[in-house]
Amino acid sequence: LFLLPSAQTRDKTSVNPSQMVKMISHLKDQFDYVILDCPAGIEQGFQNAIAGADRALVVTTPEVSAIRDADRIIGLLEANEIHKIDLIINRIRHDMVKRGDMMSSEDVVDILSLPLIGLVPDDENVVIATNQGEPLVGSNTLAGKAYQNICYRVLGREVPFMDLEKGISFWARVSGIFHKS
């Protein structure tokens, strides 16, 4: 695994899409997978990142504004002839879904009409690991297991989706029974 971070310059036009296509083509000759993390939004950084892509993983949260943005991104990907698009739903909170305060993964999939490749629960361990510079993949956390499962699915393995309700403690579930509206 090699990681090449993006440049942190103010000038996002220092590399154009044709240069990205050339660079990605060169990298594809050397690696099995070349994964580009797109910046949020649809500006030049996004256009550069998708220039050489043959597949996309759209990551969204189950919030109305995020789903609208994801839908816009999907349209742009399709307009740029990227048709292998999968969906990752991030920061899911089963307790909020049960209360009706958050869309379910099924609702998000219905709205965006993409195959689901990953469900990542909201997990404070993500913040802790990020701040400590530690990876979560391979860790004994719900999010770490979810990331590992996404990796397996990208590789073509059939892996069942985790039951996110199991990640909620017994007392939280009991409490939820008595706090229904």
What positions do the PLM features span?
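NTP-binding/hydrolysis catalytic cores, primarily Walker-type P-loop NTPases
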Residues: 132-181
